[in-house]
Amino acid sequence: MTSREASQAPLEFGGPLGVAALLILLPATMFHLLLAARSGPARLLALPAYLPGLEELWSPWALLLLFIWLGLQVALYLLPARKVAEGLELKDKSRLRYPINGFQALVLTALLMGLGVSVGLPLGALPGMLLPLAFATTLTSFIFSLLLYAKALVAPASALAPGGNSGNSMYDFFLGRELNPRLGSFDFKYFCELRPGLIGWVFINLALLMQEAELRGSPSLAMWLVNGFQLLYVGDALWYEESVLTTMDIIHDGFGFMLVFGDLAWVPFTYSLQAQFLLYHPQPLGLPMALLICLLKVIGYYIFRGANSQKNTFRKNPSDPSVAGLETIPTATGRQLLVSGWWGMVRHPNYLGDLIMALAWSLPCGLSHLLPYFYVLYFTALLVHREARDEQQCLQKYGRAWQEYCKRVPYRIIPYVY
Protein backbone atom coordinates (compact mmCIF):
# COMPACT_ATOMS: atom_id res chain seq x y z
CA MET A 1 0.00 0.00 0.00
CA THR A 2 1.50 3.32 -1.01
CA SER A 3 1.08 6.61 0.80
CA ARG A 4 -0.88 7.90 -2.17
CA GLU A 5 -3.33 4.99 -1.96
CA ALA A 6 -3.75 5.43 1.76
CA SER A 7 -4.33 9.16 1.50
CA GLN A 8 -7.37 8.47 -0.68
CA ALA A 9 -9.08 6.41 2.03
CA PRO A 10 -12.22 8.15 3.36
CA LEU A 11 -11.66 10.03 6.61
CA GLU A 12 -13.64 8.97 9.68
CA PHE A 13 -14.79 10.71 12.87
CA GLY A 14 -15.13 14.06 11.10
CA GLY A 15 -11.54 14.11 9.82
CA PRO A 16 -8.77 16.09 11.55
CA LEU A 17 -11.17 18.50 13.26
CA GLY A 18 -13.28 15.65 14.57
CA VAL A 19 -10.35 13.73 16.04
CA ALA A 20 -8.95 16.97 17.54
CA ALA A 21 -12.23 17.32 19.43
CA LEU A 22 -12.17 13.65 20.47
CA LEU A 23 -8.65 14.00 21.86
CA ILE A 24 -10.15 16.42 24.38
CA LEU A 25 -13.67 15.05 24.77
CA LEU A 26 -12.78 11.42 25.47
CA PRO A 27 -10.55 12.09 28.52
CA ALA A 28 -12.89 14.89 29.65
CA THR A 29 -15.89 12.54 29.51
CA MET A 30 -14.04 9.88 31.47
CA PHE A 31 -13.14 12.32 34.25
CA HIS A 32 -16.67 13.75 34.25
CA LEU A 33 -18.08 10.26 34.86
CA LEU A 34 -15.59 9.55 37.64
CA LEU A 35 -16.54 12.81 39.38
CA ALA A 36 -20.28 12.43 38.77
CA ALA A 37 -20.35 8.92 40.26
CA ARG A 38 -19.02 10.16 43.60
CA SER A 39 -21.00 13.41 43.69
CA GLY A 40 -24.23 13.79 45.66
CA PRO A 41 -26.61 14.39 42.72
CA ALA A 42 -24.81 11.86 40.45
CA ARG A 43 -26.14 13.63 37.36
CA LEU A 44 -24.91 12.56 33.96
CA LEU A 45 -25.74 15.84 32.20
CA ALA A 46 -24.74 18.32 34.92
CA LEU A 47 -21.30 19.82 35.37
CA PRO A 48 -19.46 18.51 38.44
CA ALA A 49 -19.72 20.62 41.57
CA TYR A 50 -15.96 21.07 41.62
CA LEU A 51 -12.98 20.44 39.37
CA PRO A 52 -10.04 18.69 41.04
CA GLY A 53 -6.73 20.49 41.06
CA LEU A 54 -3.46 19.04 39.86
CA GLU A 55 -2.59 18.01 43.42
CA GLU A 56 -5.63 15.69 43.41
CA LEU A 57 -4.93 14.30 39.95
CA TRP A 58 -1.19 13.78 40.01
CA SER A 59 0.33 11.11 42.23
CA PRO A 60 3.69 9.41 41.65
CA TRP A 61 2.28 6.45 43.59
CA ALA A 62 -0.55 6.11 41.09
CA LEU A 63 1.95 6.17 38.23
CA LEU A 64 4.07 3.54 39.99
CA LEU A 65 1.00 1.37 40.59
CA LEU A 66 0.06 1.67 36.91
CA PHE A 67 3.53 0.60 35.78
CA ILE A 68 3.53 -2.33 38.22
CA TRP A 69 0.16 -3.41 36.81
CA LEU A 70 1.35 -3.11 33.21
CA GLY A 71 4.57 -4.94 34.06
CA LEU A 72 2.61 -7.77 35.67
CA GLN A 73 0.39 -8.16 32.62
CA VAL A 74 3.41 -8.09 30.28
CA ALA A 75 5.04 -10.84 32.35
CA LEU A 76 1.86 -12.95 32.21
CA TYR A 77 1.61 -12.36 28.45
CA LEU A 78 5.15 -13.72 28.01
CA LEU A 79 4.44 -16.94 29.90
CA PRO A 80 4.10 -20.12 27.81
CA ALA A 81 0.68 -20.16 26.15
CA ARG A 82 -1.73 -23.08 25.89
CA LYS A 83 -1.94 -22.28 22.20
CA VAL A 84 -0.30 -20.01 19.63
CA ALA A 85 -2.67 -18.87 16.88
CA GLU A 86 -2.01 -17.32 13.49
CA GLY A 87 -3.74 -14.13 12.43
CA LEU A 88 -5.25 -13.41 9.04
CA GLU A 89 -2.98 -13.04 6.04
CA LEU A 90 -1.39 -9.59 5.77
CA LYS A 91 -0.72 -7.57 2.62
CA ASP A 92 2.78 -9.04 2.36
CA LYS A 93 1.24 -12.55 2.53
CA SER A 94 2.69 -13.22 5.99
CA ARG A 95 0.75 -14.22 9.10
CA LEU A 96 1.55 -13.03 12.60
CA ARG A 97 1.50 -15.41 15.57
CA TYR A 98 -0.29 -14.64 18.83
CA PRO A 99 -0.17 -16.34 22.25
CA ILE A 100 -3.59 -17.44 23.49
CA ASN A 101 -3.13 -17.11 27.24
CA GLY A 102 -5.43 -14.25 28.26
CA PHE A 103 -7.68 -16.40 30.45
CA GLN A 104 -4.57 -17.81 32.08
CA ALA A 105 -3.48 -14.23 32.82
CA LEU A 106 -6.87 -13.50 34.43
CA VAL A 107 -6.67 -16.58 36.68
CA LEU A 108 -3.05 -15.94 37.69
CA THR A 109 -3.84 -12.29 38.41
CA ALA A 110 -6.75 -13.39 40.61
CA LEU A 111 -4.49 -15.82 42.50
CA LEU A 112 -1.86 -13.13 43.03
CA MET A 113 -4.51 -10.64 44.17
CA GLY A 114 -5.97 -13.19 46.56
CA LEU A 115 -2.53 -13.87 47.99
CA GLY A 116 -1.91 -10.14 48.30
CA VAL A 117 -5.18 -9.49 50.12
CA SER A 118 -4.48 -12.40 52.48
CA VAL A 119 -1.21 -10.75 53.58
CA GLY A 120 -2.72 -7.30 53.95
CA LEU A 121 -2.83 -5.74 50.47
CA PRO A 122 -5.39 -2.91 50.88
CA LEU A 123 -7.31 -3.53 47.66
CA GLY A 124 -10.33 -1.78 49.16
CA ALA A 125 -8.34 1.46 49.17
CA LEU A 126 -8.16 1.46 45.36
CA PRO A 127 -11.43 3.41 44.85
CA GLY A 128 -9.84 6.41 46.56
CA MET A 129 -7.07 6.36 43.93
CA LEU A 130 -9.26 6.18 40.82
CA LEU A 131 -8.81 9.85 39.88
CA PRO A 132 -4.98 9.87 40.04
CA LEU A 133 -4.87 6.44 38.42
CA ALA A 134 -7.07 7.67 35.56
CA PHE A 135 -4.85 10.75 35.19
CA ALA A 136 -1.67 8.64 35.13
CA THR A 137 -3.20 6.26 32.59
CA THR A 138 -4.34 9.14 30.36
CA LEU A 139 -0.89 10.72 30.46
CA THR A 140 0.71 7.36 29.69
CA SER A 141 -1.72 6.82 26.80
CA PHE A 142 -0.71 10.12 25.17
CA ILE A 143 3.01 9.40 25.55
CA PHE A 144 2.68 5.80 24.36
CA SER A 145 0.65 6.93 21.33
CA LEU A 146 3.35 9.46 20.44
CA LEU A 147 5.99 6.73 20.59
CA LEU A 148 3.86 4.47 18.41
CA TYR A 149 3.39 7.27 15.89
CA ALA A 150 7.15 7.92 15.80
CA LYS A 151 7.80 4.20 15.28
CA ALA A 152 5.28 4.11 12.45
CA LEU A 153 7.09 6.90 10.59
CA VAL A 154 9.91 4.47 9.78
CA ALA A 155 7.68 1.43 9.24
CA PRO A 156 7.45 -0.04 5.71
CA ALA A 157 4.40 0.86 3.66
CA SER A 158 3.12 -2.72 3.88
CA ALA A 159 2.90 -2.39 7.68
CA LEU A 160 0.61 0.66 7.65
CA ALA A 161 -3.09 0.58 8.49
CA PRO A 162 -5.59 1.32 5.70
CA GLY A 163 -7.02 4.42 7.37
CA GLY A 164 -4.19 5.78 9.51
CA ASN A 165 -1.91 6.91 6.70
CA SER A 166 -3.79 10.02 5.61
CA GLY A 167 -0.85 12.40 5.70
CA ASN A 168 -2.42 14.47 8.50
CA SER A 169 -0.34 13.98 11.64
CA MET A 170 -3.13 14.54 14.16
CA TYR A 171 -5.55 12.27 12.35
CA ASP A 172 -2.97 9.51 11.96
CA PHE A 173 -1.89 9.89 15.60
CA PHE A 174 -5.50 9.31 16.67
CA LEU A 175 -6.39 6.42 14.35
CA GLY A 176 -2.99 4.76 14.40
CA ARG A 177 -0.56 4.71 11.51
CA GLU A 178 0.87 1.21 11.92
CA LEU A 179 -1.44 -1.81 11.84
CA ASN A 180 0.49 -4.25 14.03
CA PRO A 181 3.31 -2.47 15.91
CA ARG A 182 5.61 -5.02 17.50
CA LEU A 183 8.82 -5.25 19.47
CA GLY A 184 10.17 -8.60 18.40
CA SER A 185 7.26 -10.98 18.83
CA PHE A 186 5.50 -8.76 21.39
CA ASP A 187 2.39 -7.31 19.74
CA PHE A 188 1.42 -4.03 21.44
CA LYS A 189 -2.10 -3.82 20.02
CA TYR A 190 -3.03 -7.43 20.73
CA PHE A 191 -1.65 -7.14 24.27
CA CYS A 192 -3.58 -3.97 25.07
CA GLU A 193 -6.80 -5.13 23.44
CA LEU A 194 -7.80 -7.65 26.12
CA ARG A 195 -5.23 -7.60 28.92
CA PRO A 196 -4.43 -4.59 31.15
CA GLY A 197 -7.68 -2.65 30.74
CA LEU A 198 -10.14 -5.54 30.64
CA ILE A 199 -8.57 -7.40 33.57
CA GLY A 200 -8.12 -4.08 35.35
CA TRP A 201 -11.87 -3.46 35.03
CA VAL A 202 -12.56 -6.68 36.96
CA PHE A 203 -10.26 -5.75 39.82
CA ILE A 204 -11.50 -2.16 40.06
CA ASN A 205 -14.98 -3.67 40.43
CA LEU A 206 -13.69 -6.05 43.10
CA ALA A 207 -12.03 -3.18 44.97
CA LEU A 208 -15.32 -1.26 44.92
CA LEU A 209 -17.13 -4.33 46.26
CA MET A 210 -14.58 -4.69 49.07
CA GLN A 211 -14.86 -0.99 49.90
CA GLU A 212 -18.65 -1.31 50.12
CA ALA A 213 -18.23 -4.28 52.46
CA GLU A 214 -15.95 -2.17 54.69
CA LEU A 215 -18.43 0.73 54.73
CA ARG A 216 -21.71 -1.20 55.14
CA GLY A 217 -20.75 -4.56 56.59
CA SER A 218 -21.41 -6.55 53.41
CA PRO A 219 -21.72 -5.94 49.67
CA SER A 220 -25.22 -5.26 48.37
CA LEU A 221 -27.04 -7.66 46.08
CA ALA A 222 -26.84 -5.03 43.33
CA MET A 223 -23.04 -4.84 43.71
CA TRP A 224 -22.76 -8.64 43.58
CA LEU A 225 -24.79 -8.74 40.36
CA VAL A 226 -22.74 -6.03 38.65
CA ASN A 227 -19.49 -7.74 39.63
CA GLY A 228 -20.71 -11.17 38.57
CA PHE A 229 -22.17 -10.05 35.24
CA GLN A 230 -19.08 -8.09 34.25
CA LEU A 231 -16.69 -10.84 35.40
CA LEU A 232 -18.57 -13.26 33.13
CA TYR A 233 -18.22 -10.81 30.24
CA VAL A 234 -14.47 -10.39 30.74
CA GLY A 235 -13.94 -14.10 31.35
CA ASP A 236 -15.79 -14.91 28.13
CA ALA A 237 -13.68 -12.44 26.13
CA LEU A 238 -10.46 -13.96 27.45
CA TRP A 239 -11.59 -17.58 27.15
CA TYR A 240 -12.43 -16.96 23.49
CA GLU A 241 -9.42 -14.68 23.02
CA GLU A 242 -8.53 -16.14 19.63
CA SER A 243 -11.72 -14.73 18.11
CA VAL A 244 -10.36 -11.18 18.54
CA LEU A 245 -7.91 -11.91 15.71
CA THR A 246 -10.70 -11.48 13.14
CA THR A 247 -12.15 -8.25 14.58
CA MET A 248 -11.88 -4.85 12.94
CA ASP A 249 -9.62 -3.61 15.74
CA ILE A 250 -6.97 -6.18 14.82
CA ILE A 251 -7.32 -6.58 11.06
CA HIS A 252 -8.21 -3.02 10.00
CA ASP A 253 -7.57 -0.29 12.59
CA GLY A 254 -4.11 1.04 13.29
CA PHE A 255 -2.83 1.25 16.83
CA GLY A 256 -3.06 4.90 17.78
CA PHE A 257 -4.55 7.00 20.53
CA MET A 258 -8.10 5.81 19.82
CA LEU A 259 -7.31 2.23 20.78
CA VAL A 260 -4.51 2.97 23.25
CA PHE A 261 -6.67 5.27 25.38
CA GLY A 262 -9.72 3.10 24.86
CA ASP A 263 -7.98 -0.09 25.95
CA LEU A 264 -5.90 1.28 28.83
CA ALA A 265 -8.06 4.07 30.29
CA TRP A 266 -11.61 4.20 28.93
CA VAL A 267 -12.44 0.54 29.54
CA PRO A 268 -11.40 0.15 33.19
CA PHE A 269 -12.46 3.58 34.42
CA THR A 270 -15.78 4.02 32.58
CA TYR A 271 -16.93 0.41 32.30
CA SER A 272 -16.73 0.17 36.11
CA LEU A 273 -19.19 3.08 36.38
CA GLN A 274 -22.05 0.94 37.71
CA ALA A 275 -19.96 -0.38 40.60
CA GLN A 276 -18.66 3.14 41.30
CA PHE A 277 -22.23 4.46 41.38
CA LEU A 278 -23.38 1.72 43.77
CA LEU A 279 -20.55 2.41 46.20
CA TYR A 280 -21.58 6.05 46.61
CA HIS A 281 -25.33 5.64 45.94
CA PRO A 282 -26.54 2.27 47.30
CA GLN A 283 -29.74 1.01 45.69
CA PRO A 284 -32.31 -1.42 47.13
CA LEU A 285 -32.80 -4.54 45.02
CA GLY A 286 -35.27 -7.28 45.88
CA LEU A 287 -34.80 -10.92 45.00
CA PRO A 288 -37.64 -11.09 42.41
CA MET A 289 -36.22 -8.14 40.46
CA ALA A 290 -32.71 -9.57 40.77
CA LEU A 291 -33.93 -12.85 39.26
CA LEU A 292 -35.57 -11.00 36.35
CA ILE A 293 -32.34 -9.09 35.72
CA CYS A 294 -30.40 -12.37 35.81
CA LEU A 295 -32.82 -13.81 33.24
CA LEU A 296 -32.21 -10.81 30.99
CA LYS A 297 -28.46 -11.31 31.36
CA VAL A 298 -28.78 -15.01 30.47
CA ILE A 299 -30.81 -14.15 27.35
CA GLY A 300 -28.24 -11.57 26.25
CA TYR A 301 -25.33 -13.90 26.87
CA TYR A 302 -27.10 -16.77 25.07
CA ILE A 303 -27.54 -14.62 21.96
CA PHE A 304 -24.03 -13.14 22.18
CA ARG A 305 -22.21 -16.42 22.71
CA GLY A 306 -24.42 -18.42 20.36
CA ALA A 307 -23.91 -15.98 17.48
CA ASN A 308 -20.16 -15.67 17.99
CA SER A 309 -19.64 -19.41 18.41
CA GLN A 310 -21.70 -20.17 15.31
CA LYS A 311 -19.64 -17.74 13.24
CA ASN A 312 -16.31 -18.98 14.61
CA THR A 313 -17.23 -22.64 14.11
CA PHE A 314 -18.29 -21.98 10.53
CA ARG A 315 -15.04 -20.14 9.78
CA LYS A 316 -12.91 -22.96 11.17
CA ASN A 317 -14.88 -25.90 9.80
CA PRO A 318 -17.95 -25.34 7.58
CA SER A 319 -18.53 -29.12 7.65
CA ASP A 320 -19.04 -29.18 11.42
CA PRO A 321 -22.43 -30.84 12.11
CA SER A 322 -23.62 -27.80 14.10
CA VAL A 323 -23.29 -25.48 11.08
CA ALA A 324 -23.24 -27.80 8.05
CA GLY A 325 -26.97 -27.38 7.43
CA LEU A 326 -26.97 -23.58 7.51
CA GLU A 327 -27.85 -21.70 4.33
CA THR A 328 -25.07 -19.60 2.80
CA ILE A 329 -24.40 -17.12 0.00
CA PRO A 330 -21.19 -17.68 -2.02
CA THR A 331 -18.86 -14.70 -2.56
CA ALA A 332 -16.21 -13.86 -5.13
CA THR A 333 -13.53 -14.22 -2.44
CA GLY A 334 -14.37 -17.89 -1.98
CA ARG A 335 -15.89 -17.37 1.45
CA GLN A 336 -19.52 -18.06 2.31
CA LEU A 337 -21.90 -15.66 4.06
CA LEU A 338 -24.21 -17.26 6.61
CA VAL A 339 -27.82 -16.37 5.87
CA SER A 340 -29.60 -18.61 8.37
CA GLY A 341 -29.19 -19.45 12.03
CA TRP A 342 -28.29 -16.49 14.22
CA TRP A 343 -26.92 -14.58 11.24
CA GLY A 344 -30.20 -14.92 9.38
CA MET A 345 -32.07 -13.17 12.19
CA VAL A 346 -30.13 -9.89 12.03
CA ARG A 347 -26.80 -8.95 10.44
CA HIS A 348 -25.11 -8.46 13.81
CA PRO A 349 -26.77 -10.74 16.38
CA ASN A 350 -23.67 -10.56 18.59
CA TYR A 351 -24.23 -6.80 18.93
CA LEU A 352 -27.82 -7.44 19.99
CA GLY A 353 -26.66 -9.80 22.73
CA ASP A 354 -24.02 -7.29 23.79
CA LEU A 355 -26.63 -4.55 24.21
CA ILE A 356 -28.97 -6.77 26.23
CA MET A 357 -26.10 -7.67 28.58
CA ALA A 358 -25.18 -3.99 28.92
CA LEU A 359 -28.74 -3.22 29.99
CA ALA A 360 -28.72 -6.14 32.44
CA TRP A 361 -25.67 -4.92 34.32
CA SER A 362 -27.05 -1.37 34.51
CA LEU A 363 -30.49 -2.29 35.88
CA PRO A 364 -29.19 -3.24 39.37
CA CYS A 365 -28.47 0.49 39.77
CA GLY A 366 -32.20 1.25 39.73
CA LEU A 367 -34.09 3.78 37.65
CA SER A 368 -33.63 6.94 39.70
CA HIS A 369 -30.45 8.08 37.91
CA LEU A 370 -29.41 8.22 34.27
CA LEU A 371 -25.69 8.06 35.09
CA PRO A 372 -25.37 4.25 35.39
CA TYR A 373 -26.98 3.93 31.96
CA PHE A 374 -24.23 5.93 30.28
CA TYR A 375 -22.64 2.66 29.18
CA VAL A 376 -25.86 1.53 27.47
CA LEU A 377 -26.18 4.87 25.64
CA TYR A 378 -22.50 5.02 24.70
CA PHE A 379 -22.37 1.36 23.68
CA THR A 380 -25.46 1.72 21.50
CA ALA A 381 -23.83 4.64 19.67
CA LEU A 382 -20.55 2.72 19.42
CA LEU A 383 -22.16 -0.39 17.96
CA VAL A 384 -24.28 1.58 15.49
CA HIS A 385 -21.12 3.35 14.32
CA ARG A 386 -19.17 0.09 14.21
CA GLU A 387 -21.99 -1.58 12.32
CA ALA A 388 -21.86 1.19 9.71
CA ARG A 389 -18.10 0.65 9.35
CA ASP A 390 -18.67 -3.11 9.07
CA GLU A 391 -21.27 -2.56 6.35
CA GLN A 392 -18.89 -0.42 4.32
CA GLN A 393 -16.03 -2.90 4.68
CA CYS A 394 -18.22 -5.89 3.77
CA LEU A 395 -19.71 -4.12 0.75
CA GLN A 396 -16.23 -3.36 -0.56
CA LYS A 397 -15.06 -6.91 0.13
CA TYR A 398 -18.05 -8.99 -0.99
CA GLY A 399 -19.86 -6.68 -3.44
CA ARG A 400 -23.06 -8.18 -4.85
CA ALA A 401 -23.00 -11.08 -2.40
CA TRP A 402 -23.23 -8.60 0.47
CA GLN A 403 -26.06 -6.73 -1.26
CA GLU A 404 -27.92 -10.03 -1.60
CA TYR A 405 -27.29 -10.80 2.07
CA CYS A 406 -28.71 -7.40 3.07
CA LYS A 407 -31.86 -8.10 1.05
CA ARG A 408 -32.26 -11.47 2.74
CA VAL A 409 -31.50 -10.09 6.22
CA PRO A 410 -32.88 -6.52 6.27
CA TYR A 411 -32.45 -5.78 9.99
CA ARG A 412 -29.03 -4.76 11.24
CA ILE A 413 -29.04 -5.22 15.03
CA ILE A 414 -32.57 -5.31 16.50
CA PRO A 415 -35.20 -7.41 14.67
CA TYR A 416 -38.06 -5.33 13.22
CA VAL A 417 -36.58 -2.15 14.70
CA TYR A 418 -33.13 -1.46 13.26
Curated annotation (Swiss-Prot):
<keyword id="KW-0153">Cholesterol metabolism</keyword>
<dbReference type="Pfam" id="PF01222">
    <property type="entry name" value="ERG4_ERG24"/>
</dbReference>
<feature type="binding site">
    <location>
        <position position="405"/>
    </location>
    <ligand>
        <name>NADP(+)</name>
    </ligand>
</feature>
<keyword id="KW-1207">Sterol metabolism</keyword>
<keyword id="KW-0444">Lipid biosynthesis</keyword>
<comment type="pathway">
    <text>Steroid biosynthesis; cholesterol biosynthesis.</text>
</comment>
<dbReference type="GO" id="GO:0050661">
    <property type="term" value="F:NADP binding"/>
</dbReference>
<feature type="transmembrane region" description="Helical">
    <location>
        <begin position="355"/>
        <end position="377"/>
    </location>
</feature>
<keyword id="KW-0521">NADP</keyword>
<feature type="binding site">
    <location>
        <position position="338"/>
    </location>
    <ligand>
        <name>NADP(+)</name>
    </ligand>
</feature>
<comment type="function">
    <text>Catalyzes the reduction of the C14-unsaturated bond of lanosterol, as part of the metabolic pathway leading to cholesterol biosynthesis.</text>
</comment>
<dbReference type="InterPro" id="IPR001171">
    <property type="entry name" value="ERG24_DHCR-like"/>
</dbReference>
<keyword id="KW-0560">Oxidoreductase</keyword>
<keyword id="KW-1133">Transmembrane helix</keyword>
<feature type="transmembrane region" description="Helical">
    <location>
        <begin position="287"/>
        <end position="304"/>
    </location>
</feature>
<feature type="binding site">
    <location>
        <position position="343"/>
    </location>
    <ligand>
        <name>NADP(+)</name>
    </ligand>
</feature>
<feature type="transmembrane region" description="Helical">
    <location>
        <begin position="13"/>
        <end position="35"/>
    </location>
</feature>
<dbReference type="GO" id="GO:0050613">
    <property type="term" value="F:Delta14-sterol reductase activity"/>
</dbReference>
<feature type="transmembrane region" description="Helical">
    <location>
        <begin position="129"/>
        <end position="148"/>
    </location>
</feature>
<keyword id="KW-0753">Steroid metabolism</keyword>
<dbReference type="InterPro" id="IPR018083">
    <property type="entry name" value="Sterol_reductase_CS"/>
</dbReference>
<dbReference type="GO" id="GO:0006695">
    <property type="term" value="P:cholesterol biosynthetic process"/>
</dbReference>
<feature type="binding site">
    <location>
        <position position="315"/>
    </location>
    <ligand>
        <name>NADP(+)</name>
    </ligand>
</feature>
<keyword id="KW-0256">Endoplasmic reticulum</keyword>
<dbReference type="GO" id="GO:0005789">
    <property type="term" value="C:endoplasmic reticulum membrane"/>
</dbReference>
<keyword id="KW-0752">Steroid biosynthesis</keyword>
<keyword id="KW-0472">Membrane</keyword>
<feature type="binding site">
    <location>
        <position position="390"/>
    </location>
    <ligand>
        <name>NADP(+)</name>
    </ligand>
</feature>
<dbReference type="GO" id="GO:0043235">
    <property type="term" value="C:receptor complex"/>
</dbReference>
<protein>
    <recommendedName>
        <fullName>Delta(14)-sterol reductase TM7SF2</fullName>
        <ecNumber>1.3.1.70</ecNumber>
    </recommendedName>
</protein>
<feature type="binding site">
    <location>
        <begin position="394"/>
        <end position="398"/>
    </location>
    <ligand>
        <name>NADP(+)</name>
    </ligand>
</feature>
<comment type="similarity">
    <text>Belongs to the ERG4/ERG24 family.</text>
</comment>
<feature type="binding site">
    <location>
        <begin position="350"/>
        <end position="351"/>
    </location>
    <ligand>
        <name>NADP(+)</name>
    </ligand>
</feature>
<feature type="transmembrane region" description="Helical">
    <location>
        <begin position="62"/>
        <end position="81"/>
    </location>
</feature>
<keyword id="KW-0152">Cholesterol biosynthesis</keyword>
<feature type="transmembrane region" description="Helical">
    <location>
        <begin position="102"/>
        <end position="124"/>
    </location>
</feature>
<keyword id="KW-0492">Microsome</keyword>
<keyword id="KW-0756">Sterol biosynthesis</keyword>
<feature type="binding site">
    <location>
        <position position="311"/>
    </location>
    <ligand>
        <name>NADP(+)</name>
    </ligand>
</feature>
<keyword id="KW-0812">Transmembrane</keyword>
<feature type="transmembrane region" description="Helical">
    <location>
        <begin position="255"/>
        <end position="277"/>
    </location>
</feature>
<keyword id="KW-0443">Lipid metabolism</keyword>
